[in-house]
Each structure stands twice: as structure tokens, then as C-alpha cells.
């Protein structure tokens, strides 16, 4: 919307100019994550190198009235604009490229053409649009208890075994306390992104190293989450040898759910204040 609105105003597009609205929406999709289209998140050293990422430039769009536009970035900035960076961002969070749903139009990316226009300049043309969806997306938020989260590090000889033991101790103590919640125990350095609370996750990892046990749990009541944190902190004196760097905290949690509502039930109300 932050791209499509100004384009409609500047070029005098009407709400039934569906192909133009589709092109403007695709432009907004490319811009919505900022520097991702100029090389951030794209970068993968040795495979997809991006120069001077620390000084990455944010994207600039040069838009024509016919729906064609150019993606570029400021001069003397790092990053990269190429057909590859644009393609990755086009597909980012896109479930169906032929039906990209926003309230004003259903954008169609399947006929897009990308063309290099010199260094760090890519032409995008061929955006299409179809009638807008009959239903709108709404996000519902509600309270969902409290998360207790705490960590403890183990380093040096036999560190992995000590970290595993710490995780087992915490799991058993939480069970003894009778805390009913969503408990997760993982070992950072041994597979925290891929859940590490099993033997297979640490296969072929060095026993001597630097590992950090992270424990988290979501509970209905704040004091229950605090109990989890306290148990992890107790590992200093009541856990495996030489734990250190402990920290923990409790935070309130919210859950979200997405639903579809009939657009006829939504009455837009816009208020603009000029300061």
C-alpha cells in the first residue's frame, strides 16, 4: 500500500486499472523488506557474494506510468541489485505467484520479465492484475500466558556431555514440579535451529567445545514461568560441572491467528492528521 497509494495518486490510476494496480503491488512487494532486494538476506559467501554488505544501500524505484519500473540503489553504497536478487525477493513469502492477494487487487507475477539495465539496475515489466479478493485477511491477537527462558554455557573438555546432562536434569525437574506447558530444551552449537533435544542431533560433534543449553517453556501463570528460570539458574550449584554465563527472564506471550472476513463487513475509516 505504501507504494501503490503514491503511484495511484501521481499517475491518476483508477481502481479498475487492474494491470497497473498489479504492477504497483508487485513493486511494493519488492520494496517491502527494504535491503533484501539489494542483497541483504540474499548474501551467501562463496555462493552468492554481495559486495560491502555492511554499507548496503536501500532500494530505489524509477516507475513509469505504463507499469514498467526499474529497481536500483544509491551510488556509493554496498549491496547488489541483479536479476537474482529481484527474483528471490519476488518469491519471498509468495504462496501463489499468479494470485498475490492484497485488498485492492490480485496481482499476477507469472508474466514478469526482468532485464539488466547496467550495474545495479534491473527493469521489471509485465505485471498484471485481476479483480480483488472477496475476503480480507484479519489478524486476531490474544494473551497466551508467559514464557520462561534461560540459558547456561558449558565449555572445555567433555562440554557436550555436560550440556546434555544439564538438559536432562532440567527436563526431569520440570516434570517433578508438575509444570504443564510447552517445554523446549536445546543445545546451541549442537543444533538449536534444528531441534537438538535428542541423541541424533549431536552425532559427530566434538565433545570438547563450547555449548550453551537453552531452555524455554510457555505457561499460563507468570510464577510458573519463573520456576523454570529458577531451575536453570540452580544449575550453578545443582547441576553438571563448570556451568557459567547463566541468564534468564520471563516475558508475556501473545498468540495470533489469521482469518478471512467478508469485505462487505469492513467499513474503512481513514483519519489524517497534519502536524
Where are the regions that the model predicts?
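C-terminal non-catalytic interaction/assembly regions of soluble proteins
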Residues: 125-275
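A conserved active-site cap/scaffold subdomain adjacent to cofactor or substrate pockets
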Residues: 20-131, 147
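A glycine- and small-aliphatic-rich helix-loop capping segment at beta-alpha/alpha-beta transitions
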Residues: 6-18
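Compositionally biased, low-complexity repeat tracts
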Residues: 18-20, 63, 205, 235
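An acidic, phosphate/nucleotide-engaging active-site surface
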Residues: 1
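Structural signal for hydrophobic packing residues in well-ordered secondary-structure cores
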Residues: 11-12, 30-38, 65-68, 87-102, ...
Amino acid at each position: 500500500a505504501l507504494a501503490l497509494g503514491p503511484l495511484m495518486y501521481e499517475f491518476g490510476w483508477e481502481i479498475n486499472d487492474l494491470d497497473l494496480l498489479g504492477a504497483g503491488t508487485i513493486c511494493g512487494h519488492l520494496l517491502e523488506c527494504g535491503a533484501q532486494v539489494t542483497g541483504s538476506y540474499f548474501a551467501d559467501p562463496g555462493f552468492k557474494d554481495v559486495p560491502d554488505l555492511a554499507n548496503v544501500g536501500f532500494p530505489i524505484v524509477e516507475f513509469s506510468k505504463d507499469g514498467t519500473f526499474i529497481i536500483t540503489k544509491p551510488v556509493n553504497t554496498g549491496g547488489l541489485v541483479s536479476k537474482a536478487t529481484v527474483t528471490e525477493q519476488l518469491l519471498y513469502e509468495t504462496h501463489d505467484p499468479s494470485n498475490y492477494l492484497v485488498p485492492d487487487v490480485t496481482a499476477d507475477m507469472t508474466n514478469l520479465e526482468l532485464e539488466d539495465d547496467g550495474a545495479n539496475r534491473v527493469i521489471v515489466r509485465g505485471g498484471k492484475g485481476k479483480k480483488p479478493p472477496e475476503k480480507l485477511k484479519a489478524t486476531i491477537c490474544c494473551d497466551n500466558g508467559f514464557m520462561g527462558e534461560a540459558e547456561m554455557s558449558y565449555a572445555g573438555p567433555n562440554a557436550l556431555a555436560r550440556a546434555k546432562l544439564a538438559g536432562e536434569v532440567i527436563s526431569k525437574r520440570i516434570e517433578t514440579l508438575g509444570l504443564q506447558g510447552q517445554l523446549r530444551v536445546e543445545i546451541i552449537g549442537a543444533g538449536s535451529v534444528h531441534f537438538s533435544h535428542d541423541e541424533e542431533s549431536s552425532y559427530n560433534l566434538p565433545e570438547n567445545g563450547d555449548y550453551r543449553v537453552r531452555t524455554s517453556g510457555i505457561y499460563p501463570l507468570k510464577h510458573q514461568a519463573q520456576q523454570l528460570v529458577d531451575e536453570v539458574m540452580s544449575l550453578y550449584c545443582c547441576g553438571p560441572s563448570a556451568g557459567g554465563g547463566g541468564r534468564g527472564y520471563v516475558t508475556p506471550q501473545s498468540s495470533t491467528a489469521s482469518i478471512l472476513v467478508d469485505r462487505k463487513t469492513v467499513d474503512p475509516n481513514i483519519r489524517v492528521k497534519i502536524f
